[in-house]
Amino acid sequence: IGGVPGEIYPGTWKIGIGIFTEYVAQKLGEQTGEIVLTVSDRKDEVSDPICGECWVENGLHISEKSYRWENVFCPESGWYMGDFHTHTRLSDGKETIGHASERAEESGLDFYVPTEHNLMHTGWCKTSLCVLPGIEVTTDKGHMNLFGITEMPEKILEIVKHNGEEIIDTYMDQTIAQAKQKGWIRSINHPFLTIWK
């Protein structure tokens, strides 16, 4: 999940590992941990494949062809029930995308927005739900969801890299401006939960 399917071309690649420092501090305290990364040319089965629609092509852009933006899930007007703030194993959730979809369907939801911390899903499993691409922009100053995203926010890597620094305000302002320009819906998450300011 969260990967971009396709060839891995020869060249220099960088691997970014996002660690939520607030969770590390809660779980480890002053202890240290070790991250081991093994690179191999062996092809293994993917443990949590998309098993459905791939939303991206040629990078992290969700195009008109790869996501059915014009699809009508229910032609009738009325009240619809859904979840605008969810997490899977891609960030700090505990569920696979398949299990999350099953639970949402069993709960009678009409729509579901996966909003991972500073990450976006690149596809979703087959489901009757309207699944809308989203992201939770996560900083030490607060969290903001973006709904209906068509690509990763341009400043997301800077936001992750410079979290806790003064420059973060500039990157957040730029992200809000980009969201407004692209027509993405913005929502401030848990504004009164003081652990995340």
What are these regions (language model features)?
Residues 65-197:
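A metal-dependent hydrolase metal-coordination microenvironment
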Residues 2-6:
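Beta-strand-rich interaction surfaces with strong enrichment in secreted/lumenal proteins
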Residues 8-11, 16-79:
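Non-catalytic propeptide/linker segments at domain boundaries
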